[in-house]
Each structure stands twice: as structure tokens, then as C-alpha cells.
Amino acid sequence: MSIEQSQLLAGKKGIIFGLANKKSIAWGIAQALKAQGASLAFTYLNEALEKRVRPLAEELGAELILECDVQNDQHIEKVFNQVEEAWGGLDFVVHSVAFADGADLKDRFHKTSRDGFKLALDILSLIHI
């Protein structure tokens, strides 16, 4: 049996933060997880991004598509509560969210502002389970 046919993640449920488009790392991860039988949930930041995320999530048969600003603790808590209510639990999280202030991208990395670095770090690493 090939790995493509093995369904290693059948019955497993996971949520993906950070899907933006078909060039996203999150898209490739989501496709691989779905191919292995996982049930998927996705998040989006706001209504504007929902218009891009929802069609992609639906293409992969997403069971949950939820709004979540990862800088907002109440949003994070609400998302995990919604997942708990719908699925009774969660097997994995994919955190593929990244952000940097445009002003900090205009110069060399070592010239990133302290506030810009804190913002990027906050967004990159704040999902806790």
C-alpha cells in the first residue's frame, strides 16, 4: 500500500491557522492532511480574508470555517470552544500565520524596529493549547 492510499490521519481532526491562497504553505499542508484522511477546520482574520479562505477551505471539504484574530485572546478562546463544541476535541493545530509591518520590511532585517519585532513574534507564536 502506498502512503497516498494509507489514510494515516483518518478520524483525526485539526485546525489550520494562516491559509491565505493556493501559494500558502498552509495550503500545501492542508492538501496533504486531507489526502491522509484528516477532517479540517480553517480560520480567517476578517470578512475580507474570509472571501479568499472560504472557497479554498470548502474545496477541501472543511467542516468548520471560523473567524479568528490571533492577536485577540477572546477570538482564540472562542475558536477553540467552537471546535470543542463541534468535534469534542482536537488532534492537531497547524499555525501558519505570519505578519510583519511593511515599514520593517523596507530595510535590512537587523534594522527591524523593536515594536515591529514584537508584533511579528506575537502573531507568529501566540496559539496555545
Which residues fall in each region the model found?
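Canonical Rossmann dinucleotide-binding motif of NAD(H)/NADP(H)-dependent dehydrogenases/reductases
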Residues: S6-F42
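Conserved small/polar residues in nucleotide/adenosyl-binding loops
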Residues: I127-I129
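Conserved mid-core segment of classical short-chain dehydrogenase/reductases
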Residues: A57, C68, N72-E77, N81-A86, ...
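Local beta-strand N-terminus motif with an aromatic residue
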Residues: A62, G89-L90, F117
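Conserved glycine-rich Rossmann-like NAD(P)H-binding loop of the short-chain dehydrogenase/reductase
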Residues: Q36-R54
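Glycine/Thr-rich phosphate-binding loops of Rossmann-like dinucleotide-binding domains
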Residues: S24-I25, E50, D101-D104
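Conserved hydrophobic beta-strands of the Rossmann-like cofactor-binding core
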Residues: K13-I15, V93-A98
